[in-house]
Regions:
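Amphipathic alpha-helical
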Residues: 68-93
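Internal alpha/beta scaffold segment
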Residues: 1-69, 136
Length: 177
């Protein structure tokens, strides 16, 4: 079993104090104990409601990576959305953008913030899906068919070439529950 808590800040002075950290440790301990004694359930396949970090992780992994430009390039990348440009891929009440210019959102520091990408291009908001319709991809300077220019999302891991990557993926909905 594993439990972790992460804190995002632009400087150490913005991290939680010892009292908050101690409370989180106690909370994680209680959560682990509850998991340890919880009954094992059968796998579930059906609708789910996600919130908070679970929703963020889901959209980052399942949708965000598929919208990175290099994922449209080769067969080995899946090309999930390559032929769906201009088509409905989400409900019309949902839109998705990526905005590395945001430092904070609702009081939370965002780790995807940057001023310039790893190719020297100025960071900027990109509206990827508008009202459910796929509009564009996250691009570096390495072109793909139909996209000759960077949109400020060229990011690289140490020792690797920059590719179109997520900064701060923002999912919005005009319908809420």
């Amino acid at each position: 079993m594993f439990r972790a808590e992460t804190f995002e800040a632009d400087a150490t002075g913005h991290l939680p104090d010892q009292k908050v950290l101690a409370a989180k440790i106690t909370e994680m301990g209680k959560s682990l104990e509850a998991l340890r004694v919880a009954p094992i359930t059968d796998p579930y396949n059906g609708p789910a409601i996600l919130s908070g970090r679970a929703a963020a992780g889901f959209f980052h992994e399942v949708l965000g990576h598929r919208l990175e430009g290099q994922r449209q390039r080769g067969d080995d990348e899946g090309q999930t959305f390559t032929k769906l440009l201009g088509k409905q891929i989400l409900p019309s009440f949902m839109s998705v953008s990526d905005d590395p210019t945001l430092k904070k959102f609702d009081g939370t520091w965002l780790s995807g913030h940057y001023y310039y990408d790893d190719e020297g291009q100025q960071a900027r908001r990109v509206d990827l899906i508008k009202n459910g319709v796929l509009d564009t991809f996250l691009m570096s300077r390495l072109p793909i068919a139909g996209f000759a220019h960077s949109n400020g999302h060229g990011r690289a891991e140490v020792g690797h070439m920059p590719t179109g990557r997520q900064g701060n993926l923002i999912v919005t909905s005009s319908k809420t529950v």
